[in-house]
Amino acid sequence: MPGKLRSGAKLGSDGAEESMETLPKPSEKKTRKEKTKSKTEEATEGMEEAVSSKAKKTNKKGPSEDDVDPPKSRKAKKQEEEPQDDTASTSKTSKKKKEPLEKQADSETKEIITEEPSEEEADMPKPKKMKKGKEANGDAGEKSPKLKNGLSQPSEEEADIPKPKKMKKGKEANGDAGEKSPKLKNGLSQPSEEEVDIPKPKKMKKGKEASGDAGEKSPRLKDGLSQPSEPKSNSSDAPGEESSSETEKEIPVEQKEGAFSNFPISEETVKLLKARGVNFLFPIQAKTFHHVYSGKDLIAQARTGTGKTFSFAIPLIEKLQGGLQERKRGRAPQVLVLAPTRELANQVSKDFSDITKKLSVACFYGGTPYGGQIERMRSGIDILVGTPGRIKDHLQNGKLDLTKLKHVVLDEVDQMLDMGFADQVEEILCVAYKKDSEDNPQTLLFSATCPHWVFNVAKKYMKSTYEQVDLIGKKTQKAAITVEHLAIKCHWTERAAVIGDVIRVYSGHQGRTIIFCETKKDAQELSQNTCIKQDAQSLHGDIPQKQREITLKGFRNGNFGVLVATNVAARGLDIPEVDLVVQSCPPKDVESYIHRSGRTGRAGRTGVCICFYQNKEEYQLAQVEQKAGIKFKRIGVPSATEIIKASSKDAIRLLDSVPPTAISHFKQSAEKLIEEKGAVEALAAALAHISGATSVDQRSLINSQAGFVTMILRCSIEMPNISYAWKELKEQLGESIDAKVKGMVFLKGKLGVCFDVRTEAVTEIQEKWHDSRRWQLTVATEQPELEGPPDGYRGRMGQRDGSRGAFRGQRGGSRNFRGQGQRGGSRNFRGQRPGGGNRGQKRSFSKAFGQ
């Protein structure tokens, strides 16, 4: 009967002989013992409980319940076991008694034969190996076989029996064939003789049947149990349902909240939005949509690059298109959008035009002819975007009617209500607004920066029930979180050259960079500086409007890579793929820094903003850090290695763009050059020339001064003072080092110093210096972390005749800025007299910081 054990008496001689054939050799047993020795303690309690529970039940063909002896120790069992009437069994038993008891127990545990398994049992996975030294059954001749997962008539107690471990493939085992009830490797009853030689099927993956005849066998659960065929379809469907639920979980919350189906947006508008690459509403758009659509006044604040323009454009267009009346010629605008710059006004107008084909959108700003704008007003306008100056001109000339306004938007409201525009905005809005009237147009104010005074000024234009949406709130960081903020200390005389190196490393020839300057003159000069290898154009107020539009369009299209601009490009401009923003000096107000840095890192992209500063601008930089809630990472100028590496990458990219037809014309020259110089030398020279890096100046990593190399002297202990480093330098390099080192400052934790030396002195210093357990001298490849910002040079650059005042000057000037020399000193920062007793002159704090 399938699933039942036969008694040892009924096994017969054939079974015994077969068992003898399948017994493994002692060496094989020993090998298995060694492999499982480390696992002998895992299932001791479970196996003992299994033995005791199974000892209470017997096969119908085996001995009765009364004949079952209680479980005994392995030694006692071996002594009491007696051979059955089968001769083969007797000989086998006597042979096994000669083996050590431990090996006998192991063979009884692992080497078992099986009775005919059912189809379900044959399909089950192979069990794990049993622990060495633990018998899988009690008295083998008297007890039922150990089952897996309760199959083959399990009792309640048997269901809890731990699963035996897998036997090795191809190792047929048997206990005492005549005495013990044989077991399968998977815990089932013994198979027929034909089945013994059948190779075991390979392990199948979960959900796959081990047997090829799928129609006859039930599917397996993960735990190896068989299952009725009906639920099979359900189990196959489960992975699909699970994967679909996982897909839903993977959708970000922002996309779920911003799905178009959550808002009353027409299909036509959705198609136009998708054409612009907008597949869902951004957080600021989703949170303001219903306020704008329902006609409520609103003040909204969100970081740069988060999509504020569409926050008011989409709901206003849907509202106007929903109540669209007859399009009369000469109709007055219903929506007025005011922007601080011409470039921003032009961009907002384009955003409106891109998502509506039914409404008329016009843009009025200075620098363009009046005639075309007057003609647009005669034709009729639904949405008017413009700058305050030109809108005011049309009002004063009586050409523009704003009495029909229903919606007014002030983009970059903090600048629109500031002193520069406040009077013009007041004059424009007083035409459509009445004091304390509920019939005033809906007022919408948007910006990335909203100081407290903005709310006070804005209240006179807004209803008392206005809404406020602030996605920045009390968060410390006001600037874009997708932008990395870096700072480089550099004197203004070195600034242009260092900016050129920075662009090479952080943007390259293929990237786009915006450089912000404080004045129009600086912007014009920097755009024409030869240190900037990439094509550069300037954008400022003195450039004619037509040229400004051409320049901005060319930069958007990638016709040139560097745009040098004043604040006209700081606000609102959405220029794609700007990799780097450079600010030539800290701005006067933190709002300008936030808007400038926001030209990169837009719409989920990341970007870098680098701010240059001098000693006297440390205070301004700290103010930006405090108010913008950011922390600048102070870095040194790009090293020669970094510049060359970046330049070579750019040159290789340029090689990829050369067409094959052009290459064929240069093959003969290339072959000749390779013969003369060699392939590597020739190609390296070509790459250097293409990249423009034929000569790279070494620069100080402390203050960016050309012709200097920064070196680091590390100490294994904390240094009490800076003279501790000077003493070690003089001991190894001699007194002459006094004239070669300058700008020495502590490293973080005072575990060393860094200083500058002239480029030509580096090799000499490296040859003379010998590292010790306490001191190690290296050339810096990047700016080290300093104990504090260096307060200018206090070094020992002076001569013995008294010219060391500013740099350190123990004999030729003091260690402070004013160079209080004891024997004179002509090289301090403040000194006026070339010799003797130069004490410099005092300066006030405000003068020192240019305030």
Curated annotation (Swiss-Prot):
The gene is Ddx21. This is Nucleolar RNA helicase 2. Its EC number is 3.6.4.13. Residues 807-833 are annotated as: 3 X 5 AA repeats. Highly expressed in liver and testis. Expressed at lower level in brain, lungs, and skeletal muscle. It comes from Mus musculus (Mouse). GO terms for biological process: chromatin remodeling; defense response to virus; innate immune response; positive regulation of canonical NF-kappaB signal transduction; positive regulation of myeloid dendritic cell cytokine production; positive regulation of transcription by RNA polymerase I; positive regulation of transcription by RNA polymerase II; positive regulation of transcription by RNA polymerase III. Sequence repeats lie at residues 117-153, 154-190, 191-227, 807-811, 817-823, 829-833. The lineage of its organism: Eukaryota, Metazoa, Chordata, Craniata, Vertebrata. CDD domains: DEADc_DDX21_DDX50, GUCT_RHII_Gualpha_beta, SF2_C_DEAD. Residues 26-42, 99-113, 133-145, 170-182, 207-223, 246-257 have a biased composition (Basic and acidic residues).
